[in-house]
Curated annotation (Swiss-Prot):
<dbReference type="InterPro" id="IPR023458">
    <property type="entry name" value="Met-tRNA_ligase_1"/>
</dbReference>
<keyword id="KW-0547">Nucleotide-binding</keyword>
<feature type="short sequence motif" description="'KMSKS' region">
    <location>
        <begin position="347"/>
        <end position="351"/>
    </location>
</feature>
<comment type="subunit">
    <text>Monomer.</text>
</comment>
<dbReference type="GO" id="GO:0005829">
    <property type="term" value="C:cytosol"/>
</dbReference>
<dbReference type="GO" id="GO:0046872">
    <property type="term" value="F:metal ion binding"/>
</dbReference>
<feature type="binding site">
    <location>
        <position position="159"/>
    </location>
    <ligand>
        <name>Zn(2+)</name>
    </ligand>
</feature>
<feature type="short sequence motif" description="'HIGH' region">
    <location>
        <begin position="14"/>
        <end position="24"/>
    </location>
</feature>
<protein>
    <recommendedName>
        <fullName>Methionine--tRNA ligase</fullName>
        <ecNumber>6.1.1.10</ecNumber>
    </recommendedName>
</protein>
<comment type="similarity">
    <text>Belongs to the class-I aminoacyl-tRNA synthetase family. MetG type 1 subfamily.</text>
</comment>
<dbReference type="InterPro" id="IPR014758">
    <property type="entry name" value="Met-tRNA_synth"/>
</dbReference>
<dbReference type="InterPro" id="IPR029038">
    <property type="entry name" value="MetRS_Zn"/>
</dbReference>
<dbReference type="GO" id="GO:0004825">
    <property type="term" value="F:methionine-tRNA ligase activity"/>
</dbReference>
<dbReference type="InterPro" id="IPR009080">
    <property type="entry name" value="tRNAsynth_Ia_anticodon-bd"/>
</dbReference>
<dbReference type="InterPro" id="IPR033911">
    <property type="entry name" value="MetRS_core"/>
</dbReference>
<dbReference type="InterPro" id="IPR015413">
    <property type="entry name" value="Methionyl/Leucyl_tRNA_Synth"/>
</dbReference>
<keyword id="KW-0067">ATP-binding</keyword>
Length: 570
């Protein structure tokens, strides 16, 4: 366990344009929720924050496609994403919005502080303007023929076919990816740049001090810091209508009228603003004790969760904003980053509708099925792959055959022989003593993995704890003992029933609904076990045989789902 009693947890904030797929979920929100639930169960004070990332060109275009004003579209999609998060039992203390007044004010505040520190430069640059669209086009919204390979759908930042990096002016016959118009003009425009290069030494020292970070996190950070020309200054404003208006604190910024801050500047600041939103909502009383080191946050451990594509911004750009401000904001202590989850021999694709999206997943199965499979296959050290065959096999084996079967067998056996009450029986014997010793070791190992956020190892240990109980029940065989020694059968039954609240407490971070069902069936509360003594349920304690925890996935279901989610959303 961390030596601090308070942990701040943030998940990379999902973009507003549409519903996210399972690959997005397992790379940020879901493991963050696992860790938050675990720490709360162990008695820590936790603040778990997430939000929707609402600014930028894709939001404007998605709103136009939906026929809605962008503010209305973002409000609607925030509500949709919040409802889906509840469906997956994501236990955010607050699910905020980057378009909030709090984030506007805080983003403008940081920009002012950075400018005061000499870390903002005004840069004249050339950008492509589309007359038909009435807007400057981001590089990736310009298409044309690649001068290198001739691919006719190359984007203005890179050719997907030959991977050559491009500028929009390199393209042959360029056109707007929004309207298809070729009526384009290169115009001069002025933008603000964050002078990250001035903070390179400070950032390098800070990253080097994080010796406990995952290799994936530090390797990406150091690559961006050191490769090629090293850390580059970064544009933090855009010529758009929708976003945080450019201001220097509370004051107007001459020459920046009509511009907004770049989404990647304001989005991480929303982590802080989200806590301020939570105060307004009433879910917490004081946000600064979590975020300001001079106001109590010096005893906070801050952990971030994200996919590997977000690592450069969280290890360099956002820390540059924090450090450059010269103010005592809380910097991240640990960044848990993830590789990609691929889908059935290819990639998940939001644009092509390929793979399972979060709303669809909840339509076909309860959230615990998805939570268990995704977390037990979390892409921590390498990319992972979702296949329907593996999903069916693992869910049926782990959840139905091992955990669900154990709970069903022992509760139904007890009901048939002793009623729905924990029997008295004799004393425990060598089998029980051996299992308690084994479970004590496994409990310690499980907690070690959870403390270290080694998710796959933690899942494997939890599975082994379930298996140990199943093997005990099979070996002790109370149904056989009952024929010749009812007292011994009663002792076995009492012991095995006590495994259920033990399992419920340990399983709750992974499968909260099933854990709650186990606890309710045993007429007890969900609590984290201090040890494996298994004394929660005394003789005479009443219980109710719970409903089937996990139904098996049939071959017909698997085949139907594999066909349904092969491409193009319904």
């Amino acid at each position: 366990m961390s030596t601090t009693s308070r942990t701040l947890i943030t998940s990379a904030i999902p973009y507003i344009n549409g519903i996210k797929h399972l690959g997005n979920l397992v790379g940020s929100q879901l493991p963050a929720d696992l860790y938050a639930r675990y720490l709360r169960a162990r008695g820590q004070e936790v603040l778990f924050l997430c939000a929707t990332d609402e600014h930028g060109t894709p939001a404007e275009l998605a709103a136009a496609k939906a026929g809605k004003p962008v503010a209305e579209y973002c409000a609607d999609m925030h509500a949709v994403q919040a409802e889906i998060a509840r469906g997956f039992r994501l236990s955010f203390d607050h699910f905020g919005r980057s378009s909030s007044p709090q984030n506007h004010a805080l983003t403008q505040h940081f920009a002012g502080k950075l400018a005061d520190a000499g870390l903002i430069a005004e840069v004249e640059e050339k950008q492509v303007y589309s007359h038909a669209d009435g807007r400057f086009l981001p590089d990736r919204y310009i298409e044309g023929t690649c001068p290198n390979c001739g691919y006719d759908k190359a984007r203005g930042d890179q050719c997907e076919n030959c991977t050559k990096q491009l500028d929009p002016t390199d393209l042959i016959n360029p056109r707007s990816a929004i309207s298809g118009s070729t009526d384009l003009e290169v115009r001069e425009t002025k933008h603000l740049y964050l002078r990250q290069s001035q903070l390179r030494g400070q950032l390098s020292d800070w990253i080097s001090s994080k010796t406990d970070w995952p290799i994936l996190t530090t390797s990406i950070a150091k690559k961006w810091l050191n490769d090629g020309d090293g850390l580059q200054d970064r544009g933090i404003t855009r010529d758009l209508d929708w976003g945080v208006p450019v201001k220097r604190g509370d004051a107007d910024w001459p020459g920046m009228e009509g511009k907004v801050f770049y989404v990647w500047f304001d989005a991480p600041i929303e982590y802080i603003a989200c806590a301020a939103e939570a105060v307004e909502e009433g879910s917490i009383s004081d946000w600064e004790r979590w975020w300001r080191v001079d106001k109590g946050a010096d005893d906070v451990r801050y952990v971030q969760f994200m996919g590997k594509d977000n690592v450069p911004f969280h290890t360099l750009s956002f820390p540059a904003t924090i450090l450059g401000s010269g103010e005592p904001w809380k910097l991240v202590d640990y960044i848990k980053s993830f590789n990609y989850l691929n889908y059935d021999g290819g990639q998940f694709s939001t644009s092509q509708g390929r793979g399972v999206f979060m709303d669809q997943a909840l339509e076909i199965l309860p959230s615990d099925y998805w939570r268990w499979w995704l977390l037990s296959h979390a892409p921590e050290t390498s990319d992972a792959e979702f296949t329907w065959e593996a999903f069916q096999q693992d869910v049926n084996k782990d959840l139905a055959d091992v955990l669900g079967n154990f709970v069903s067998r022992i509760t139904k056996f007890c009901r048939s022989k002793f009623g729905e009450v924990v029997p008295e029986g004799g004393d425990y014997g060598p089998q029980e003593t051996a299992l308690i010793a084994d479970l004590d070791k496994r409990l310690a190992a499980y907690q070690t993995h959870m403390d270290a956020i080694d998710i796959r190892k933690a899942a494997a240990e939890l599975r082994a704890i379930w298996v140990a109980g199943n093997e005990y029940l099979q070996s002790a065989a109370p149904w056989t003992a009952f024929k010749t020694d009812p007292d011994r059968a009663a002792a076995i039954t009492r012991f095995a029933l006590n495994l259920i609240p033990f399992y419920a407490g340990l399983s709750a971070p992974f499968i909260p609904d099933a854990a709650q069902a186990m606890a309710e069936g045993m007429h007890t509360n969900l609590t984290w076990p201090k040890d494996a003594r298994l004394t929660t349920l005394p003789a005479g304690h009443a219980f109710t045989v719970p409903d089937v925890l996990f139904a098996k996935i049939a071959d017909e279901q698997r085949e139907d789902w594999a066909a349904r989610f092969s491409g193009v959303r319904d």
